[in-house]
UniProtKB/Swiss-Prot annotation:
The gene is rpmC. PROSITE patterns: RIBOSOMAL_L29. Keywords: Ribonucleoprotein, Ribosomal protein. NCBIfam families: L29. This is Large ribosomal subunit protein uL29. Belongs to the universal ribosomal protein uL29 family. Gene3D superfamilies: 1.10.287.310. It comes from Leptothrix cholodnii (strain ATCC 51168 / LMG 8142 / SP-6). GO terms for biological process: translation. InterPro entries: Ribosomal_protein_uL29, Ribosomal_uL29, Ribosomal_uL29_CS, Ribosomal_uL29_sf.
Length: 65
């Protein structure tokens, strides 16, 4: 997900997005552990999406304070 798409969301939507990404990341790690995952780069992309969303969430919270 692009940063511009995340910046358009409000704080509650960002928190839900982070929660969804964390669940997806967990599922991907479990697939990797059971050797069902063929494209391992998806884990890296998901991890970076989580970091991107958390960064924007922090920016929004500090901007509102």
């Amino acid at each position: 997900m692009k940063a511009s798409e995340l910046r358009a969301k409000d704080v509650a939507a960002l928190e839900k997005e982070i929660s969804d990404l964390l669940k997806a990341h967990f599922g991907l790690r479990m697939q990797k552990a059971t050797q069902q995952l063929t494209n391992h780069s998806v884990i890296k992309q998901t991890r970076r999406d989580i970091a991107r969303a958390r960064t924007i969430l922090t920016e929004k919270k500090k901007g509102a304070a």
